[in-house]
Amino acid sequence: MLSEHGCKIAPNTYYMAKTRGISARARRDEYLKGEIDRVRAENLEVYGADKVWAQLNREGIRVARCTVERLMRDMGLSGARRGRAFKVTTCPDERQARPADLVDRHFIAPAPNRLWVADLTYVKTHAGWVYAAFVIDVFSRMVVGWQLSQALRSSLALDALEMAIWNRTRAGQVLDGLVHHSDRGVQYLSIRYSERLAENDIVASVGSKGDSYDNAMAEAFHSLYKWELIYPQGPWKGLDDVEYATLGYIDWFNHRRLHGEITDDNSYVTPAEFEAAYYRQAGPALEAVTQ
């Protein structure tokens, strides 16, 4: 065919090209595509190129970030893109006395159990709204307590707090002096909630401005929760299936999801790994103080 169009190619050149087979680079690309698919499947299919690259290298699969980016483009893959949806879950009572804002939008903590943030969000289901309460440790971004309910009741937030207290004290961790930050919602200003904080020597802090930036870290988690779990896997039937999925999501979020905002150098690490590293380093110092 080529010779008919004036292309002079030696027969041996043609047959060598035809029988050469797949190149080493092409074989490597096919292998990496399979690994990319696996990593994404193990992580709710929400990872973009950066996290896929980080996870592959954590597993000893050495590959350049640009290679992962190229292959994911070829595969038509991208990470979860976050947007914003809004439904009011805060019911402020402007007449009620509230604690001071001890955080002032500076969501930084030098160690675990120095600063928790708590907030409520919502999930639309065929059976109506499901409301979710979360408590997050600012140091590691670990979700330490959570609870779901079909009603936006005061006990919803309290149940999440109880789980957080139980999780930390069960591990032998001290909560004295911990600051608990929330918005102005009546759920967090209730008498029983305030009493439970005081019983554990936890100091209450409430945002002073009355907008989403008052509790930006909790809002950021809600965005991840929605765009990594709720929207991709919906629609939802009701409370039971949302609760079951949330249980798996929190376990993944705390122990396997890579976070790039926790460390000073923006390296990827899980909340559980970050806390474990802190206690390994702080252990000798804590022992020296108590001796």
Regions found by a protein language model. Give the residues of each.
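Structured, non-catalytic alpha/beta "coupling" segments that mediate domain-domain communication
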Residues: M1-Y15
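Basic, flexible linker segments flanking DNA-binding modules
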Residues: P11-A111, V269-A282
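Mobile genetic element proteins and their domesticated derivatives, centered on retroelements
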Residues: Y14, I36, V52, V68, ...
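RNase H-like polynucleotidyl transferase catalytic core
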Residues: R81-K87, L148, V179-R184, A198-M217, ...
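Active-site beta-loop-alpha junctions of metal-dependent nucleic acid enzymes
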Residues: R95, G128, Q147-G172, L189
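Short conserved beta-strand segments at catalytic cores or DNA/RNA-binding microdomains
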Residues: L120-A151, E162
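Acidic/histidine-rich, metal-coordinating catalytic segments
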Residues: G172-L189, S208-G210, T263-T270
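C-terminal domain-tail junction helix/linker
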Residues: I191, A198-I202, K226-Q291
